[in-house]
A protein has these predicted regions:
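Structural signature of tandem alpha-helical TPR/SEL1-like repeats
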Residues: 6-20, 42-54, 75-88, 109-122, ...
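Boundary/linker segments of alpha-helical solenoid repeat arrays
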Residues: 64, 97-98, 131-132, 165-166, ...
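Conserved alpha-helical positions within TPR/SEL1-like repeat arrays
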Residues: 30-41, 64-75, 98-109, 132-142, ...
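Alpha-helical protein-protein interaction modules
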Residues: 176, 181-188, 198-202, 206-209
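N-terminal segments that cap or nucleate solenoid repeat domains
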Residues: 2-38
Length: 209
């Protein structure tokens, strides 16, 4: 608890320092960008959007501002604006893996499964060592009914991060759908051990502790 209070005090000091610096240099894209990040951490999303937009005004090539702007729009449920922001990021840097993976995620939320998977695949082509993206791609394969590919991608995610609870949960569902209940139980227990809230009915069915 004491450590958390110290972090909050430090965060507040940084926030106030950024605002003070911005008064002195109001046309600084990095300051607007960093203040946008600070507002996002404080859950002040509208203010965060304004700061990222101002950062883009002063530096139209600041790709990270577009990506973070897209992330805020996603948190607000504005998928169209999220997609547009990440597409603009990719116009600046076509090989930015985070922009591709974020775009893929938003497209899947819109129901565009194949387009979203293409975004994940492009992100992994650029940087194969992204456990979260492999897990998301595995989840998309599961939605398509391709269980072997779903299992493959989630196992690759665990190669990168053996403690990735979501990958274990995804594998429990893929193995269960495949009929391999022993493997499903193993991953159910691992996901639970790592703190993931596994579906209680499925956990009971598998005898998962």
């Amino acid at each position: 608890m004491e450590e958390k209070k110290k972090e909050e005090v430090t965060e507040d000091k940084i926030f106030r320092a950024l605002r003070k610096q911005l008064l002195a240099t109001p046309y600084s894209a990095p300051l607007h960008y960093n203040l946008g990040l600070a507002y996002a951490r404080r859950e002040q999303l509208d203010e965060s959007i304004t700061c990222f937009q101002q950062a883009i005004v002063y530096d139209p090539k600041l790709v990270e501002a577009y990506i973070n702007l897209g992330g805020i729009y996603l948190r607000k449920g504005n998928l169209e604006a999220c997609i547009e922001a990440n597409q603009k990021a990719l116009e600046i840097d076509p090989n930015h893996p985070l922009a591709h993976s974020n775009l893929g995620f938003a497209l899947i939320q819109e129901g565009k499964l194949d387009e979203g998977m293409a975004g994940y695949q492009k992100a992994l082509e650029i940087d194969p060592n992204q456990a979260a993206v492999r897990t998301n791609l595995g989840g998309a394969y599961f939605q398509k009914g391709d269980l072997e590919s779903a299992i493959r991608e989630n196992l690759k995610a665990l190669d990168l991060n053996p403690s990735f609870a979501l990958a274990h949960n995804n594998l429990l569902h893929a193995y269960r759908a495949k009929g391999d209940l022993e493997a499903a139980k193993t991953h159910c227990e691992k996901a639970t051990e790592l703190g993931f809230q596994v579906n209680p009915e499925i956990a009971k069915e598998l005898g998962c502790r």
